[in-house]
């Protein structure tokens, strides 16, 4: 985790910022904590995007839909202000490294991993697939298609995987960096896109099933089933659309399932219900990850608890807010077994005092009026969170 800079706000909404955990096409992501101790990840939209009405409309719609996703397999959207001068959204902060960092490299949202573990054992991949399928079911039930399911958007915890950045990244779909609307724009990561995404066709939940197949092949082997982009992204996308996947090294027990997910025809791919039947695993008594990874996750949790509050925020800026969009979300129903162990998390209240914006920060120079936030109180809570990846 990086320290806050003098240009960063020290509070957003009801949350005090602790540090930077990354940045992406949509904006900066911060680790934050409420006055009652709940840790969240807050994504603050880039200023130039906040000025585009088309983006704001899509962002508002996607956040509203994403708030309806209730699953123990996702990092839930907890709070948001889509009407602020600079919109933001807060999600659960998941205590675990990304699948990408675990399998092939030390890069994690907070940069604390000392190295990669390598490909996961077959049983771990089997349970990973089950958890991800549960997450996709919840996302699809809310009327969303993730469209960017990839290893950096999957976080590993002691009691199962968590999917992050569902739905919200779609707000960038028709908005380019220059503010020009672009039709048929590609959304996704080249190595983990579906053929219909590559061709610019309409995407459906079957798109996420294809991406799931690519993710499981990667988790099993440490390699992408359609090769890397070393020869160019266009060559890689051609292979996705036209060639068979390379499943060398995938355990025999997973080859057929992954092959079915990677069918070119969306209609020929299994549904999430069919996948759950094939991924059913009654052996849940033992930890789902190897011992070395379990130990690493424990260290991550300790580091999160040891996080200290930053310096006094009184002399630093705060991201301006207007009308908070924080309608409570009904308690979700946890997934059917195998499901992770979850714990209820308490609702947090808005602070009684928030510092005024500092001159020169680049936001409107107006007094800050604290908003009354109604925080959801889900009936579950993923392990106290640790770092979403970013679209």
Locate the predicted segments by residue:
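Regulatory extensions appended to serine/threonine kinase catalytic cores
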Residues: 286-390
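Eukaryotic protein kinase
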Residues: 1-313
